[in-house]
Structures are given as structure tokens and as C-alpha cells.
């Protein structure tokens, strides 16, 4: 992965660039590091391309990880609202290293075949119920970290996805109550080794989905009240600047509420848990001929209102 100086340089470059989709300027929670700080801190991104407010400096009693922050519920969110309303020192973007907004969640739940247009590109019917698989939390990396090509795979592919971050514990959650259990949303890259997903390991998807670095997340956890409609967002993936995936989250077969209801039948959802909600068409494996990632490629995954993550393949 990029070292701290390399990631800080990348965030400086990003600050000078303009992206097609406008990120939300409201409550954008981040985990970050800086040379003068001991360990990760929680922060508040001050708008598109802006610096970071150190929430732990504003309120030293706040936890320093997102999972612990979410576990404390409304009490911690009220601190963030106070921080938003206060003129606070802002760390320049060039001085911070962005981490994944959530690290070490209890679980990462993934959904397959959940875009109608993705089903059409494969000429298969839309599923009648959600197709669930998982990634291990060890696959998570930050929004500007490297994706490491494993020597075990020759068919590593891209998938941009909307990720839902759970904010409240629940089991057997009703669809009408589901959004009360959501903290917010972020951008995910469901990197996939197709040879392991589709041809090996008994065609069980897990190993092909969970190599180290196969789940970049970020750049921020955008709280649900800062997103106008999570099911009407432009979603895009570019490889080396070329648009490979371009769709809208309105193509999702099962929306956030349905997914939470379905998954919570089987497992208890905890604060910090992540649900990757599926990918639109345009992945490499279904191109003719198939196209896969190679060393030196740069992948940009972007979702309207949420932002962009940029990961180099090494």
C-alpha cells in the first residue's frame, strides 16, 4: 500500500481535481492519521476537497474509531453537530492520510446480482431474493491505498458499489424500521478474482472476493440525512480514465431497506457493519474479450454525493 507520504501527496493532487459528481457538503465523517497525532483519529471533512476537522481534538472524550463512535449512538452525533456549527481549526488535506471510514467491522455483507442492468448484461433473470456472500474485514483498505494483485489470480476485476454502514444494532428488522438502523453511506470497490469466484473453490464466491486489499472504502461515511436519496445516485467506475461502469442506484433490485430486513433474519447487525449493495454493468469479465486489471492500472470508483476513491493496482 502507499506509505503515509504517498497518500498525503495523492490527497493533495485530488484537492486540485474536479470530479463529475458533486459530493455532499454536509456531515462527512472520516478516519485519518497525521504525523503529529498518535494513532488514528476521527474527523469531519469540511466539504469537497476541503481539510479535516479533528473531532478528537474538539472533544477528547470521543472514541478514536468509527465503530466505537457509532456504538455510542446519538450522543456522539450531537458532538459532531456542535463541531459543524463551530469555527474550528481545519487540518490541511495535504497533512492527513485518509483511512477507510470503517475499519475492523464485525462483518462485511455483500449482495450479488442486485442491479437490473447488470443482470441484463449477463442475460440472466433478476433474482427473486437477495444473493448474499461476504468479505473478511481484513480485505478493507483506505480510499487511496493500493490494490495488491495476488499471484494466485490472473483475473482480477473491478466493481463499484454503494456501501451501507449500519449505525444501530438489530435483528429481525422490519423494512419500515430499516433506515433507523443506518448510519450512512460510502463508496466501495468490490475487487474480485473471477478465476477463484467462478471456477475454483467449488464456485463459492468467498475466496475470490476477500484477498487482502480487495475492499477499498471511502472517502467518508456520509450520514444518511446528508444524502437526498440513496436509491437515485449516479454511480461510475473508471479504469485509467476510461469509463467502464456508468449507471444509477435506481437500478438496484433490492433496496437498502429490503436488504437490511433480509440479512437481519440470519444475523444480528451491529454498528459499523457494512453492506455492499451490488454493482452495475460494465465489469471486465463480461466484456468481449474479457478485460482484467494489471499492475500500474488506476481505478476510480465514484458515487454522486458520496465522493470518489482512487486505487492504484500494484
Swiss-Prot record:
Chain segments annotated as transmembrane: none
GO biological process, one term: oxaloacetate metabolic process
EC number, as in UniProt: 5.3.2.2
Cofactor: Mg(2+); Mn(2+)
EC main group: isomerase
SUPFAM superfamilies for the chain: FAH
Alphabetized InterPro entries for the sequence: FAH (IPR051121), Fumarylacetoacetase-like_C (IPR011234), Fumarylacetoacetase_C_sf (IPR036663)
Cofactor comment: Requires a divalent metal cation for activity.
Function: Tautomerase that converts enol-oxaloacetate, a strong inhibitor of succinate dehydrogenase, to the physiological keto form of oxaloacetate. It is thereby required to maximize aerobic respiration efficiency by preventing succinate dehydrogenase inhibition.
Sequence similarity: Belongs to the FAH family.
Listed name of the protein: Oxaloacetate tautomerase FAHD2A, mitochondrial
Species annotation: Bos taurus
Encoding gene (name): FAHD2A
